[in-house]
Amino acid sequence: MRDGFTADTEKVTPNIPNSVKVSNGDILFSWSASLEVMLWAFGDGGLNQHIFKVTSANDFPKSFYYFQLLNYVDVFKKMAEARKTTMGHITQDHLQQSTIAIPDDVSIAKSFEEKVSPIFDLQVKLQEEIQQLTKQRDSLLPLLMNGQASLNYDLSND
């Protein structure tokens, strides 16, 4: 999930239901094998059967359920380990049995969101920049290596 789009990534048609579309800034939870939580920052995509897009039915801020789930993932890992399967995963029952603390005053969570939201936005922006730089490197490096391009840079001044 953290690799984003690779050469092995299966492409998906844009004509998929909105319920399985993911966009930058979405919170994703991998419930099989890796059991991870992440802030998606790899562009538009589609979910597969092993990844959930996490949202709040009660209008809690994204940062609240992101960090709650991030803290709870160790509990899920213990549940998966207890099943003694070759590839750890959790079931729908595990999700339904799970509980998290919810503040009586949602304004606490919303105040936290005001502070954390810009950090989430920056994470997405930086990941987008990393992807652009990676593409540039991957296209320029072969040209440099085989002599089709050169740098006009004097290393002796460093």
Task: List each language-model region with its residue ranges.
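Short, charged beta-turn/beta-strand-edge "cap" motif at the junction between a beta-strand
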Residues: 33-37
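Sequence-specific dsDNA recognition surfaces
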Residues: 1-24
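A generic structural signal for residues embedded in beta-strands
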Residues: 29-30
